[in-house]
Regions:
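Outer-membrane beta-barrel architecture
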Residues: 10, 86-88, 99, 122, ...
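Extended, hydrophobic alpha-helical segments in both membrane/secreted and soluble proteins
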Residues: 119-121, 228, 268-270, 335-341, ...
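Solvent-exposed loop/turn segments connecting transmembrane beta-strands
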Residues: 77-80, 108-110, 361-367
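Outer-membrane beta-barrel initiation region
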Residues: 24, 43, 73-77, 87-91, ...
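Surface-exposed loop/interface segments of Gram-negative outer-membrane beta-barrel transport/assembly proteins
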Residues: 4-68, 108-114, 118-209, 229-335, ...
């Protein structure tokens, strides 16, 4: 949050241009050089480039036609815009901080770009000398536009890669026909016009995201703090990838792949902290707490082939073979209880211990809970009295050791369920086990020892 007092407003703006580092035109031959190279190659091989009946016909007149600079056709100067507005301040026991930002980037390849908008608001207020509360709100929008290299996967040899097509295509090859339509007689790039492929495709991802947190903190005495944090995070994403028929090498014509997904995370965290210093020598910090979170995500995806290129959207009137639909839902939850205690004496001797118990819905009903702990100790030798004479040289000397057991739940949400899949055998449909049930599936545990020495000289 901001500071109590006079409000402060800050505005920032930035604009930039990006270009391709191209000091020598990528070493590419111009039209005259290319024609001369082709003619010399034919002559050196014993052929006559001026014989119109020969398949090696390549007359000098080719140098007089209009040249195509494919690299310039496939790229552009990129641009960057950034704007930000910040307001902060406060009055009395209340402080605030708000910001609004916008970013837009146009890439050096046409149709490639990035757009992002964010808004943020923080508010803190002291209700009385024992109680304070606050909130953190954040909302955002993001759009990423790209070019899909669907012809050859993500290979660098895809026609939509301007650095490949710009160098593979000769300056004698036309980008457009005389009637203004795209020229597809381009065998070096699989007869796909890269200009058309980049401009006529449509690929983007849009995301709207919100994150909100509210906290309440109660401090009945100086050493004791009760705090609760409660938050929600929600995001929804829309994706679209359309490829015209001339981009796809398969027989399914124009294709469209769209998807919508969203996720939600609810979290509550509640802690009690005791922090005190006794007789100026003994420091003690104890924290106990509880945390719970619930996660849910879902998606819906549709894929269509032989899409109407005049109206490139899904249609319910097409055959089943031309459409694919899929959806999914994932849910998981975790509950944790934990405690941490730290003690140090005169900044010389430190001990720390922690323990936590976690329950995860990812595991089987018989083994969902796991208990993990850690302990550590360290000795700041340089703070001892016998080290004072050399403290100006040896600025730090610490011995430390720790041991801990931690858990890992990084598995799929439904790995402990028994699952069946459809199967056809000898013309008869049935089901076959595809995943065995495991009620005892549980946490992966890792034990770690650490021992070390920290020192610093002449600082």
């Amino acid at each position: 949050s901001g500071e109590s007092g006079k409000s402060k407003i800050t505005a920032r703006a930035r604009y930039g241009v990006s270009t391709i580092a191209n000091d020598n035109d990528f070493g590419m031959a111009n039209l005259e050089e290319y024609v001369q190279y082709q003619r010399d190659a034919r002559i050196n091989a014993g052929y006559n480039p001026d014989d119109p009946t020969s398949e090696y016909y390549f007359p000098q007149a080719m140098a007089g036609r209009r040249a195509t600079n494919w690299m310039k056709e496939l790229t552009r100067n990129g641009s960057l815009q950034e704007y930000e507005l910040i307001a902060s301040g406060g009055a009395g026991k209340t402080t605030y901080y708000t910001s609004l930002s916008y970013n837009k980037t146009n890439g050096i390849v046409p149709t490639v770009g990035f757009e992002k908008m964010q808004i943020r608001a923080n508010l803190d207020t002291e209700l009385n000398k024992w109680l304070k509360m606050g909130t953190r709100l954040h909302g955002g929008y993001m759009k990423v536009s790209d070019v899909q290299n669907s012809l050859l996967g993500d290979s660098g040899l895809a026609p939509t890669n301007p650095f490949y097509s710009g160098m593979a295509l000769a300056p004698t090859m036309n980008a457009y026909n005389e009637d203004g339509s795209y020229n597809f007689d381009l065998p070096f790039v699989f007869n796909v016009n890269p200009i058309a492929a980049i401009r006529e495709q449509d690929k983007y991802d849009k995301q709207y995201k919100f994150n909100g947190t509210v906290y309440l903190e109660w401090k009945p005495i100086k050493q004791l703090t009760f705090r609760t944090n409660n938050s929600i995070e929600y995001a929804t994403t829309t994706s679209r990838a359309y490829s015209p028929a001339f981009v796809n090498t398969a027989s399914y014509g124009a294709s469209l792949n769209t998807a919508e997904s969203q996720y939600r995370i609810l979290t509550t965290s509640n802690t009690i902290t005791y922090d005190d210093l006794f007789n100026d020598d003994h420091s003690l910090n104890v924290l106990i707490g509880q945390e719970a979170n619930a996660y849910e995500s879902s998606f819906l995806q549709g894929i269509s082939y032989h899409v109407n290129q005049q109206r490139p959207y899904h249609s319910v009137g097409v055959s089943v073979e031309d459409q694919r639909v899929g959806d999914g839902l994932t849910e998981m939850a975790m509950v944790s209880f934990f405690g941490v205690a730290e003690y140090n004496y005169k900044g010389r001797y430190y001990v720390k211990g922690s323990i936590r118990t976690d329950g995860s819905s990812k595991f089987g009903p018989d083994k969902r809970w796991g208990t993990f702990w850690a302990a550590s100790a360290s000795w700041n030798i340089h703070n001892e009295d016998f080290m004072q004479d050399i403290k100006s040289v040896l600025n730090q000397l610490k011995l430390r050791y720790s041991y801990g057991v931690n858990g890992n739940d990084n598995i799929a949400s439904y790995a402990h369920y028994g699952l069946y899949s459809d199967v056809v055998y000898n013309g008869i449909t049935g089901q076959l086990p595809s995943q065995l049930q495991n009620r005892k599936l549980t946490w992966e545990t890792n034990k770690t020892h650490n021992i070390g020495i920290d020192f610093r000289l002449f600082d």
